[in-house]
A protein has these predicted regions:
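Active-site neighborhoods and metal-handling regions in enzymes and metal-associated proteins
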Residues: 1-250
């Protein structure tokens, strides 16, 4: 305010849209670092069957994930959120609980870290110790198929309000609640960047954008989650995350 009032002879222009678009389009060097970041997540999830096992405190699991991420080159591990449930499918995340895991536990695990160079990715999976309940498998499968649907729509020119609508139509058609928040977004030096997969977003997808997409199949009792990272290509998108969607049975 001081500058606009006291600095005469200067025209102030809102360059938010310009800067957001510059940030959203990744250069070849940025894409190289993004792939490294996504690979760190994949390597951590490859180790999860050894990390998530019976008779461990939840904080021990969190610490192991953070330590492994650091050893693999993560510069900043902004978030490791886990929540286990001994009886029913996980309904959410309660970080740093002091309970021991046991057979039959289901765990929601969200990892958000950046790799060398500071570029963020994220990955979210649900894990089970032992045989998963039927409704849990169904919810996870629905979320994974919803993610596949949205991925098939992601290409240059695709509009975020259309993606948001398609996500909710699929979830509701399969008996789950519609999404009320953003279920996808750009990534880079910030964990969440534009474009945001919400009805109000005006920025369309473009080649070399890097986005995370994380639909959730929720019905008030069960939660099924899937999250992967995608690079928008000339005529579609590339799934950069290699960890399979769906449940990880440990």
């Amino acid at each position: 305010k001081y500058l606009t009032e006291e600095l005469g002879g200067v025209e102030f222009v809102d360059a938010t849209e310009l800067v957001d678009y510059i940030k959203a389009i990744k250069s070849p060097e940025e894409i190289e670092r993004i792939r490294w970041s996504a690979a760190v997540h994949d390597k951590v999830y490859a180790a999860m069957p050894a990390i998530f096992r019976p008779d461990r405190y939840e904080y021990e699991i969190t610490n192991d994930i953070r330590a492994l991420g650091g050893e693999l080159g993560a510069e900043c591990i902004i978030n490791v959120s886990i929540g286990t449930d001994p009886n029913t499918p996980v309904k959410g995340v309660v970080p740093w609980q002091y309970r021991r895991t046991k057979m039959g536990d289901k765990m929601f695990c969200l990892i958000e870290l950046n790799g060398p160079g500071g570029y963020y990715s994220e990955a979210l999976r649900t894990l089970v110790l032992g045989e998963p309940p039927k409704e849990y498998v169904q919810a996870a499968d629905t979320a994974a198929k919803c993610l596949d649907l949205i991925a098939s729509m992601m290409k240059p020119g695709a509009k975020c309000p259309d993606l948001f609508r398609a996500n909710n139509e699929y979830l509701v058609a399969h008996g789950y609640l519609p999404e009320g928040r953003l279920f996808g977004h750009g990534q880079g030096y910030d964990m969440v960047e534009r474009p945001a997969f919400v009805p109000a977003e005006t920025m369309a997808l473009a080649e070399n954008m890097y986005v995370a997409c994380h639909p959730g199949a929720v019905d008030g009792k069960v939660v099924g989650l899937a999250c992967s990272n995608f690079l928008i290509t000339k005529d579609g998108c590339e799934r950069v995350t290699t960890t399979p969607n769906g449940l990880i049975i440990c």
